[in-house]
Amino acid sequence: MHITKPHAAMFSSPGMGHVLPVIELAKRLSANHGFHVTVFVLETDAASVQSKLLNSTGVDIVNLPSPDISGLVDPNAHVVTKIGVIMREAVPTLRSKIVAMHQNPTALIIDLFGTDALCLAAELNMLTYVFIASNARYLGVSIYYPTLDEVIKEEHTVQRKPLTIPGCEPVRFEDIMDAYLVPDEPVYHDLVRHCLAYPKADGILVNTWEEMEPKSLKSLQDPKLLGRVARVPVYPVGPLCRPIQSSTTDHPVFDWLNKQPNESVLYISFGSGGSLTAQQLTELAWGLEESQQRFIWVVRPPVDGSSCSDYFSAKGGVTKDNTPEYLPEGFVTRTCDRGFMIPSWAPQAEILAHQAVGGFLTHCGWSSTLESVLCGVPMIAWPLFAEQNMNAALLSDELGISVRVDDPKEAISRSKIEAMVRKVMAEDEGEEMRRKVKKLRDTAEMSLSIHGGGSAHESLCRVTKECQRFLECVGDLGRGA
């Protein structure tokens, strides 16, 4: 039987930060482009993934057992190294699952750490695509940095000169990902290995849109600029992020938000994997209090070490007014008329969408950034790790929709925090940022438009046509045999 409906198999790295954008892409391919989609996820993420797909047809979830890597990698290895080993060890099981299907998928879509699965394409006769859930700036640096000669690398890493990238804004030394600054460490070689594999696919999908990153996308698509390194089509398919869920608005924070004036509340969250030291938490609390602005703070215990962690254990008790011990004594009492504290987790997208929210102090993870833009909310950029410094530079220097901390690796004083908060929430500069981000929000909505020929929709239409042509060729070969 000749198969006419394209079938995409998607292979996601572990962790919901990786899985959720993959799920949103799967839903888009199924609902708007006629794909049947099979998403392969590790068992640790399976339950959460199923809950995100309750109302989605045309998308199947296949669980893969989580490989035991305890004897394969140092327990203290970088998270990039650990994820890469997990994905590599899962490839044989992925292959078995695909081979067991009645018909091989038309295309295999991997994310940034799934490059070991590219070898399956030739064997099983599939197209392959790399999905970068981050942005075009990240993609550009990722594919360009490994091609640099040692002299240029030394100018950047030793002499701390900005990294010049064809057709793009230069990247400051302070903004480059830490992994690129340690060429003798395993994490550097692991990251470079993945990045060098991206151009081996048939195309690269990136979670951005033309108006968000015009220079980087133009360079990636120009064969005289970064396109000569990418070597394959680069498709902007964003913004892809979790949709707002009306069912989550029964959280008590919304009762409080409903009583606040429009655009008067600053939302503060460093994401599920970000943390501050005890000293920095104290300075942040004092800065918020002295700013005299309304706020919602998703506050977690301090971690005096790396700013990157997956989980946080409860630490310390509370004082008599329920102020956590790691915050200034009496903080909750003194700010109770204008502040709302949330431990651990909050319905972020729904909070940002509320009319009372007028600013977002964020770690600049790409998903959080997209949620803020889609809600028309300007930001205070406080990056912590990975590509977040580059994201912060994009938001503040290129787009003008955020203010930015001077150096997130140094302690930020309460006076600087107060000034940033007031700038976004109470001064003319904040109003200008708000105007710009709302305009950018409108372009994001246009990008997603099905009937208006939005750039994201058109990009996926091109991918769909490529898959359909491939299906026709496979069918012709089958009939010829």
Curated annotation (Swiss-Prot):
Keyword Glycosyltransferase included in the entry's annotation: yes
PANTHER family linked: UDP-GLYCOSYLTRANSFERASE 72E1 (PTHR48046), UDP-GLYCOSYLTRANSFERASE 72E2-RELATED (PTHR48046:SF5)
Domain of life: Eukaryota
Assigned keywords, A-Z: Glycosyltransferase, Transferase
Protein name: UDP-glycosyltransferase 72E3
Primary role: Involved in the O-glucosylation of monolignols (alcohol monomers of lignin). Glucosylates coniferyl alcohol to form coniferyl alcohol 4-O-glucoside. Glucosylates sinapyl alcohol to form sinapyl alcohol 4-O-glucoside. Possesses low activity with sinapate as substrate.
Binding site residues for UDP-alpha-D-glucose: A346, Q348, H363, W366, S368, E371, E387, Q388
Tissue specificity as recorded in UniProt: Expressed in seedlings and roots, and at lower levels in flowers and siliques.
Active site per UniProt: H18 (proton acceptor), D111 (charge relay)
Classification via InterPro entries: UDP_glucos_trans, UDP_glycos_trans_CS
Coiled coil, from the record: none
Record: residues binding an anthocyanidin: H18, A386
Source organism of this protein record: Arabidopsis thaliana (Mouse-ear cress)
Reaction(s) this enzyme catalyzes, per UniProt: (E)-4-coumarate + UDP-alpha-D-glucose = 4-O-(beta-D-glucosyl)-trans-4-coumarate + UDP + H(+); (E)-sinapyl alcohol + UDP-alpha-D-glucose = 4-O-(beta-D-glucosyl)-trans-4-sinapoyl alcohol + UDP + H(+); (E)-coniferol + UDP-alpha-D-glucose = 4-O-(beta-D-glucosyl)-(E)-coniferol + UDP + H(+); (E)-sinapate + UDP-alpha-D-glucose = 4-O-(beta-D-glucosyl)-trans-sinapate + UDP + H(+)
